[in-house]
């Protein structure tokens, strides 16, 4: 399964990149908009979600636990400096996907113990 982590370039915006990844067969999209205001992330998520659904792809938000439900996302990816996985699980419940950044075996063990998927 291919995963696409969105990014912005002057020639290809977030949605265009997501669209191209989905058309190329991607089945997992992570909307990553570091330092963007929540309103902008939510607006982009509302545009990306139907594209993901149309292509049968999972849609994951980067960092924004508080926007997952409103955006209709399948889950969230948490970086090492974001909310701990166990706190996010309390907010999102058992049915949402929670992933995290793991660069070492110790990171993997920690994330697993906290309840990451």
Name what the model sees in each region.
Residues 1-85, 90-105, 110-117:
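Conserved N-terminal beta1-alpha1 strand-loop-helix module at the mouth
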